[in-house]
């Protein structure tokens, strides 16, 4: 089979400045983007007589998260999103649940350490978005406090922090009130 070459194409185009799909081209080298996106997810079972801490805020509840740390699903998902954006691993790698040093630890301490690590690697947090799936208790009364607490720990304006809560319409383990999950997206810039 005959392949059309540059000479054939140029002869057809006769000097036209229009793009010719047959003309060979060299791939342009793309600059590495300074903006990076990360995604995080976390889930914990719920049990009686444990504290429920979400987004750095203790939420009044008869049930709380079963976890090695304080079980803050929102912060754990956020840490994974931030670490993922910078390709720095995940929360389990940095703070393994096999290490007694992290037993019962306040997750805002973990988030602070993640933010410091990002800074050391030359990243700045642009914005974060978190969705928490929990049937009960309702989180709406606590959202603004969560946003403020997370912004404080990360050292960014509260307007760069979005926290949303949803039920799962009684579907899945969240709907059956067996557990809570959180999803997070983070945008960071390499400065």
Regions found by a protein language model. Name each.
Residues 21-34:
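Short, Lys/Arg-enriched N-terminal segments with co-localized hydrophobic residues
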Residues 148:
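Active-site phosphate/pyrophosphate- and oxyanion-stabilizing loops and adjacent acidic/basic residues
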Residues 34-145, 154:
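RNase III-family endoribonuclease catalytic core
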Residues 163-167:
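Pyridoxal 5′-phosphate
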Residues 157-160:
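Short acidic capping loops at alpha-helix termini that bridge into adjacent secondary structure
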Residues 174-191:
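C-terminal edge-of-domain segments
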